[in-house]
Amino acid sequence: MAKIKKRGESGAAKNYVTRNQALKKLQISLSDFRRLCILKGIYPREPLNKKRANKGSSAPASFYYHKDIQYLLHEPLLVKFREHKAFAKKLARAIGRQEWGLAKNLEDAKPVARLDHLVRERYPTFTLALQDLQDPLNLVHLFSTLPTNPIPGKTLVPSEVIAECSRLISEWKLWAIRTHSLRKMFLGIKGVYYECEVPGQGGEPVRVRWLEGFEFQQHVPHDVDFRILLTFLDLYRTMVGFVLFKLYTDENLVYPPPLDVELDEQGESVGAFKLVERKAAEGADGKTQVSKKAVRKAIKGIKAAGDDADVDMDEGAKETDEEEDEDFVERPSKAQEVDDVASAPLTTYNSLLATSSTPARQNLLFSPYTFYLSRETSSRTWEFVVRAMGGKVITSLTAPTPADAPNADSITHVIIDRPITVERMREMEAGRKWVWIQPQWVADCVNKQKIISSEGYGPGQLLPPHLSPWDGEGELYRPWLEEQGEKAAEGQEGEEEEEAAEQDEGESEDEEEDGKEEVAAEYPPALLAAAQNPSDASLLHAAELEAETNGVSHSAFRAQLKEATKVHAKKVPASQKEKKGEEDLRKIMMSNKKAKLYEKMQYSNREKAAEKEKLEKKRKAIEKRKAKEAKA
């Protein structure tokens, strides 16, 4: 006879433990348990049957996996938490006895918990760390902009933490400027979105996107729990430090980069740090030792440069061949390739280093230009963007007047974000040719990866719509904006023919709209909706309520509904009737629950289509009005 199982020793009661049971098992406080769970990535679970998991009790409780709590028992941070608890007791006793020397010694020997092992556990590979770098960068930047004054009723964020966050953000931007890895940016409501391309393991690029708030005074809300945020920040600071060390080491740079105190006191953020290359290791005989990593990186750079050169040569050969003879395409001989390789000079270590030090694909869009940032623009944002794209930045013209400044001759573009008169522009230029633009021009050039025309971006002009470069990742496609760009680039050719065609189309559209308006004026809107979809009970009920509000009798309402249904049926083509019949057959085969869900989906789709049509008509009306204003 089988042994009877005891209650609570198997199943959900064994797999799950409540939070109170976990606290007793770990012998720590609730605050330490929360901090430990955040650092280790453990979160509450939802059992299928809470009553069974709670051993028959129906009291509300938070549940965790039993294996997760067993895993926490071996965490080295538990020892640090207990040491900190003992330290707090000793420090409180010393302060109570006014033993200030002992209190200072205890403060100097305060136990500090290191989180390096947690970063290695949670991110075993460098690519995984890069894929999860968005939240750390967002939080680190948020704390770098917090005020250092006390928050009423809250714990003050230490100034050392804010300074370290500012340093990490500056080091990250400095690396992006050095490698020219900026790819996209967007000026949103919350702030400025950036996207960089970071080389991961094996040379595979990883896209890292983060958000930086605008430079406004931060008002910290009172309902924010800074203890939880600081716990996340401790982990994220360590993680960002790991990533930056790896990135700087791969670029043969010293990390952390040294800080110029004088420039830092002058208010320079990124420019206060100096990039210093690491010295090559020397052996006992004084010769330079070459590491395997440096050789692999140099070979990879040579391969990339060779591939680019081959592609360029192939494209050039194809273009010339197509111009001479489109039917014949000449291919290079394999024997010739072998002779070229055999006759080529041998590759030396110095040539390897020279090739690897200059990346094959650098994003140097603004390299020929020098930008002057006006006082009202955000120097932190636009200096980073311009320098990351290879350009030069001037933030101040040291002279009594801008025209007399010694560095004014090198300026090619002026970024200004306020209206300015033509006389003032000519006075500042003093005979020079400067391009006056608004900041959006820089962002649009970065997103399109090319220098676009500055027309329409002048000071005080109405800017074109600033679109998100990530629109293709799930949002609606808006082809008319591309059509506008093509029309602006090609010029206005054949305007008279287009105007005549537009007039004909407008007349036909007006006739169709007049016919629709006549039908709409004859019947109320709810009645028309019910006539278009007679099987929808909700639309029929809404039409009945509308008729009752208008004082129409039930018999008259039925007659109007029947007549409107007939009118709509005449306009419906045969293909739509067949489609409607197929949908009805599908609904017959559905269960009642699925049929209701299907009706809800169809209703939401109709609402979206109606809203889309409404916005489309509004857009066309605005375009027509703008075209008329431009002609006038």
From Swiss-Prot:
GO BP, sorted A to Z: maturation of 5.8S rRNA from tricistronic rRNA transcript (SSU-rRNA, 5.8S rRNA, LSU-rRNA); maturation of LSU-rRNA from tricistronic rRNA transcript (SSU-rRNA, 5.8S rRNA, LSU-rRNA)
Bias (Acidic residues): 307-328, 492-516
Source superkingdom: Eukaryota
Region Disordered, annotated ranges: 306-341, 485-535, 565-585, 601-632
Regions of compositional bias (Low complexity) in chain numbering: 521-531
Chain ranges of the BRCT domain: 361-459
Coiled coil: 595-632
Keyword Metal-binding belongs to the record: no
GO MF assignments: ribonucleoprotein complex binding; RNA binding
Role of this protein: Component of the NOP7 complex, which is required for maturation of the 25S and 5.8S ribosomal RNAs and formation of the 60S ribosome.
Taxonomic source organism: Cryptococcus neoformans var. neoformans serotype D (strain JEC21 / ATCC MYA-565)
Protein name: Pescadillo homolog
Protein family (similarity comment): Belongs to the pescadillo family.
InterPro entries linked: BRCT_dom, BRCT_dom_sf, PES
GO cellular component terms attached to this protein's record: nucleoplasm; PeBoW complex; preribosome, large subunit precursor
Name of encoding gene: NOP7
Biased composition (Basic and acidic residues): 576-585, 605-616
Keyword Coiled coil annotated: yes
